[in-house]
């Protein structure tokens, strides 16, 4: 008798009013599973010119040290050396947010990224007027005894 009252209190079970599932044809079920992907994650391959334009714009919009360092980290993470125009924008951004150490480290990043010392010297020659204008000293000039 107690089980009758429990059933009456709970109400009718959901199974009594459940709709009966209609069997689907096999063709309709097969479309849900596939061995080949319909959607591909094809990405546009960014050219060096697009990369340069994007990072120049990013560095021109920098408002604080965090943004500057994040953009530098992202720019140097690619398997290429940023162009002198990107580096010039980064140096100007470093001086704009008054971050002298990061400006010096930009040149350390260049030195680590280039393939040989000749390329590093070319970057230094290209950026020398801007470096002198902004008053940025190289690590080699700050610590001559550590120069390799």
UniProtKB/Swiss-Prot annotation:
<dbReference type="GO" id="GO:0046872">
    <property type="term" value="F:metal ion binding"/>
</dbReference>
<keyword id="KW-0349">Heme</keyword>
<dbReference type="GO" id="GO:0045277">
    <property type="term" value="C:respiratory chain complex IV"/>
</dbReference>
<comment type="function">
    <text>Component of the cytochrome c oxidase, the last enzyme in the mitochondrial electron transport chain which drives oxidative phosphorylation. The respiratory chain contains 3 multisubunit complexes succinate dehydrogenase (complex II, CII), ubiquinol-cytochrome c oxidoreductase (cytochrome b-c1 complex, complex III, CIII) and cytochrome c oxidase (complex IV, CIV), that cooperate to transfer electrons derived from NADH and succinate to molecular oxygen, creating an electrochemical gradient over the inner membrane that drives transmembrane transport and the ATP synthase.</text>
</comment>
<keyword id="KW-0479">Metal-binding</keyword>
<keyword id="KW-0999">Mitochondrion inner membrane</keyword>
<comment type="similarity">
    <text>Belongs to the cytochrome c oxidase subunit 5A family.</text>
</comment>
<feature type="transit peptide" description="Mitochondrion">
    <location>
        <begin position="1"/>
        <end position="40"/>
    </location>
</feature>
<dbReference type="GO" id="GO:0005743">
    <property type="term" value="C:mitochondrial inner membrane"/>
</dbReference>
<comment type="pathway">
    <text>Energy metabolism; oxidative phosphorylation.</text>
</comment>
<keyword id="KW-0496">Mitochondrion</keyword>
<keyword id="KW-0408">Iron</keyword>
<dbReference type="InterPro" id="IPR003204">
    <property type="entry name" value="Cyt_c_oxidase_su5A/6"/>
</dbReference>
<dbReference type="Pfam" id="PF02284">
    <property type="entry name" value="COX5A"/>
</dbReference>
<protein>
    <recommendedName>
        <fullName>Cytochrome c oxidase subunit 6, mitochondrial</fullName>
    </recommendedName>
</protein>
<comment type="subunit">
    <text>Component of the cytochrome c oxidase (complex IV, CIV), a multisubunit enzyme composed of 11 subunits. The complex is composed of a catalytic core of 3 subunits Cox1, Cox2 and Cox3, encoded in the mitochondrial DNA, and 8 supernumerary subunits Cox4, Cox5a/Cox5, Cox6, Cox7, Cox8, Cox7a/Cox9, Cox6b/Cox12 and Cox6a/Cox13, which are encoded in the nuclear genome.</text>
</comment>
<dbReference type="GO" id="GO:0006123">
    <property type="term" value="P:mitochondrial electron transport, cytochrome c to oxygen"/>
</dbReference>
<keyword id="KW-0809">Transit peptide</keyword>
<keyword id="KW-0472">Membrane</keyword>
<dbReference type="InterPro" id="IPR036545">
    <property type="entry name" value="Cyt_c_oxidase_su5A/6_sf"/>
</dbReference>
<dbReference type="GO" id="GO:0004129">
    <property type="term" value="F:cytochrome-c oxidase activity"/>
</dbReference>
């Amino acid at each position: 008798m107690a089980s009758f009252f429990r059933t009456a209190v709970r109400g009718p079970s959901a199974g009594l009013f459940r709709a009966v599932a209609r069997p689907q044809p096999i063709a309709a079920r097969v479309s849900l599973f596939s061995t080949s992907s319909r959607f591909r994650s094809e990405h546009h391959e960014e050219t060096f010119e697009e990369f340069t334009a994007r990072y120049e714009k990013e560095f021109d919009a920098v408002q604080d040290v965090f943004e500057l360092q994040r953009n530098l980290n992202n720019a140097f993470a690619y398997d290429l050396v940023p162009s002198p125009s990107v580096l010039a924008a980064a140096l100007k951004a470093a001086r704009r947010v008054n971050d002298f150490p990061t400006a010096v480290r930009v040149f350390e990043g260049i030195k680590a990224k280039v393939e040989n010392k000749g390329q590093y010297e070319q970057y230094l020659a290209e950026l020398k007027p801007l470096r002198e204008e902004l008053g940025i000293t190289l690590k080699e000039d700050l610590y001559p005894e550590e120069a390799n």
